[in-house]
A protein has these predicted regions:
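Short, C-terminally biased terminal segments at protein or domain edges
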Residues: 1-81, 85, 89-154
Length: 154
């Protein structure tokens, strides 16, 4: 069993930030923080891009783990999809529900990433980097959900 070290350049390829203009560039896409979403929206999308890149990198390595790789891909990209859906929630309860699903998916993604790391399929450096992003999303989601529930109960 060999540990995969994802090249940081490959992993974060073409991700640049221009804070003066509130723009994040991911590959060919320009993402405007103010126009197109909150920091949670932008960070969850950037995380989904990292998950897709990791999936593409890992699938060429070992087809035996395809089931786990697909689980990481599904849960890791679902976070951003649910955050995106929450922007058009029909009610505050629907908003909390969408973000709660995103939180569950983030927690599941953390599980699969930890499993791959402890099985020595993801290197320490790659794991620490991507898990840090995942934990940051979990903290943001928990905070927003608590605030939204508090506002809803007032």
């Amino acid at each position: 069993m060999k540990s995969v070290t994802m090249n940081e350049e490959m992993e974060k390829k073409s991700v640049t930030e221009d804070p003066e203009r509130d723009v994040l560039e991911i590959g060919q896409m320009r993402y405007n923080y103010k126009r197109e979403g909150s920091p949670l929206h932008v960070k969850s999308y950037a995380f989904a891009v990292r998950i897709v890149r990791m999936f593409l990198h890992l699938t060429g390595d070992d087809a035996k783990l395809m089931v786990i790789y697909r689980q990481v891909l599904k849960s890791g990209t679902s976070i951003s999809a649910n955050v995106h859906e929450s922007e058009f929630a029909q009610s505050s309860s629907d908003f909390v529900s969408k973000l709660s699903i995103a939180l569950k998916e983030a927690n599941e993604t953390d599980y699969w990433l930890t499993l791959l790391h402890e099985s020595e399929y993801i290197s320490d450096d790659s794991f620490v980097s991507i898990q840090s992003d995942c934990k940051e999303l979990i903290k943001l989601l928990v905070s927003i959900i608590k605030t939204a529930k508090g506002n809803h109960n007032q």
